[in-house]
Amino acid sequence: MTSVINVNLPTQSYEIAIAPASLDQIGQSLAGLKLGKKVLLVSNPTIFKHFGKVAVDSLEAAGFQVASYSLPAGERYKTLNSIQKLYDIALENRLERSSTMVALGGGVIGDMTGFAAATWLRGINVVQVPTTLLAMVDSAIGGKTGVNHPHGKNLIGAFHQPRFVLIDPQVLKTLPVREFRAGMAEVIKYGVIWDAELFNQLEQSKRLDQLRYIKPELVDAILTRSCQAKADVVGKDEKEGGLRAILNYGHTVGHAVESLTNYRLLKHGEAVGIGMVAAGQIAVNLELWQQADADRQNALIEKAGLPTKLPVGLDIEGIIEALQLDKKVKDGKVRFVLPTQIGVVTVTDEVTSDHIRQVLQQM
């Protein structure tokens, strides 16, 4: 079953195609976009081994001249040094303004390829072909690109929308279990912030911790409803002037935890799971949310095999200090996304360090 979701933007609208066994059709998909002939396919070694040949063959069969380059996997490689390597390859292959970078991989590859495309020759085409659940439902959509700074996540970046997003659910079969669980954090997030029906469907599933235990129709719903939620929010607020900030639910504390553990201890989705538990409890303590709903959220996070406690030995004061570097800080105040009911959230700067400390000490 193929689903097409439109991301409608004032500048450049595009399609998200969710189609099983579609990776070998990528050349045809791109041929219809009237792009230049030169393509740089960026991946990581593991993903390229699984899917690189299929993608390259398809692109070449459609008449594209394809160069490929693999960057190391992992958040700690999401740096300007890696971007420099992509610039070198772009120069070597004489990429032009009409050329395209194709990101074949998870969130890290997508973010870096998008940023390289945004900045090479002041902006060339990028196409996202996400291979992890997290990238499929979140990072490949919406045009946020960037790299990490030693003192904070995604502090260096640009908004650069893709020309097209191709999601082939069958590639999830090769995804390690821990990566699948990390992606489920973003899916649960959409249920809490936007889509109560998705939340209910997740509650009805006996297990959420491994792809093979989830019914195919729920996998379809997870992908289509999550992508639709992201497309709806981005379509209303492309550059995070207001509404789009809700997509950062769980990310405020989550990013601080990732940064303090040097991006080595936790997957992004695991940190987001911890961040959602923290944000949910802050909302309860501020009497914005019912404890029963927070418990329902936490039960889903646990059912997805995600952590709900802070890593042992993490300095709580360090987390509170790191929050000041969050991108959502406005006039020196940390802005938190907090739920008010399942499917509805609010953004507030009324959360004090004491509120945060009180919750984190219980985690």
Swiss-Prot record:
One GO MF term, please?
3-dehydroquinate synthase activity
| Record-listed NAD(+) binding positions | G107, V108, I109, G110, D111, T131, T132, K144, K153
Cellular component (GO) terms are: cytoplasm
UniProt: Zn(2+) binding residues: E186, H251, H268
User: Mind telling me which InterPro entries this protein's record contains?
Assistant: Dehydroquinate_synthase (IPR050071), DHQ_synth_AroB (IPR016037), DHQ_synth_fam (IPR030963), DHQS/DOIS_N (IPR030960), DHQS_C (IPR056179)
Task: Identify the metabolic or biological route this protein is part of.
Answer: Metabolic intermediate biosynthesis; chorismate biosynthesis; chorismate from D-erythrose 4-phosphate and phosphoenolpyruvate: step 2/7
The record lists the catalysed reaction(s) as:
7-phospho-2-dehydro-3-deoxy-D-arabino-heptonate = 3-dehydroquinate + phosphate
Q: Which segment of the chain is annotated as a signal peptide?
A: none
Chief localisation class: cytoplasm
In terms of Pfam families, this protein maps to:
DHQ_synthase, DHQS_C
Q: Where in the cell is it found?
A: Cytoplasm
| Class of enzymatic activity (EC top level) | lyase
Keywords of the record, alphabetical order, are: Amino-acid biosynthesis, Aromatic amino acid biosynthesis, Cobalt, Cytoplasm, Lyase, Metal-binding, NAD, Nucleotide-binding, Zinc
Gene3D superfamilies the record matches: 3.40.50.1970, Dehydroquinate synthase-like - alpha domain (1.20.1090.10)
- List, alphabetically, the PANTHER family matched: 3-DEHYDROQUINATE SYNTHASE, 3-DEHYDROQUINATE SYNTHASE, CHLOROPLASTIC
- This protein is called 3-dehydroquinate synthase
Which organism does this sequence originate in? Nostoc sp. (strain PCC 7120 / SAG 25.82 / UTEX 2576)
